Amino acid sequence: MKMMIAVFVSILLLMFSLSSTAMGMETEQQNMEERADMDFTGIAESIIKKIKETNAKPPARFDPATFGENED
């Protein structure tokens, strides 16, 4: 009986974790869509182009190998 309760609780926790992750991903998707739909009236085209290029790039990652190469 104790084993069944433990399994049931584990399944509930797993379901909660997955639903929380899905909700977080949905919120992030909505934020990305809102950023894409910004109103750029009155802003120079060159600035708009730079903003869109920046938003299209993936986030930067730290790579320690690049520091090792430049220490000559």
UniProtKB/Swiss-Prot annotation:
Task: Please describe how the activity of this protein depends on temperature.
Answer: Partially and reversibly loses its structure as temperature increases.
* One GO CC annotation: extracellular region
> Which superkingdom does the taxonomy of this entry point to?
Eukaryota
Which biological process terms from the Gene Ontology are attached to this UniProt entry? defense response to bacterium; defense response to fungus; killing of cells of another organism; regulation of blood pressure
Q: How does activity track with pH?
A: Shows stability to pH variations.
Q: How is it used?
A: This peptide encapsulated in chitosan nanoparticles shows an improvement of antifungal effects on growth inhibition, viability, and biofilm formation in vitro.
Entry keyword set? Antibiotic, Antimicrobial, Bradykinin receptor impairing toxin, Fungicide, G-protein coupled receptor impairing toxin, Hypotensive agent, Phosphoprotein, Secreted, Signal, Toxin
Which stretches are tagged as propeptide in the UniProt entry? 25-35, 61-72
Signal peptide stretch: 1-24
Listed GO MF terms: toxin activity
Q: Where in the cell is it found?
A: Secreted
Q: In which tissues is it expressed?
A: Expressed by the venom gland.
* KW Signal (keyword) present: yes
Role according to the record: Potentiates the hypotensive action of bradykinin (BK) in normotensive rats, and induces a vasorelaxant effect in mesenteric artery rings that is induced by endothelium-dependent release of nitric oxide (NO). Does not inhibit angiotensin converting enzyme (ACE). Shows neither hemolytic activity nor cytotoxicity to normal and cancer cells. Shows moderate antimicrobial activity against the fungi Candida albicans and the filamentous fungus Trichophyton rubrum, as well as against the bacteria C.albicans (MIC=128 ug/mL), C.tropicalis (MIC=128 ug/mL) and Aspergillus flavus (MIC=128 ug/mL).
Please state which protein family the record places this protein in: Belongs to the non-disulfide-bridged peptide (NDBP) superfamily.
Q: What is this protein called?
A: Hypotensin
Q: Which organism is it from?
A: Tityus stigmurus
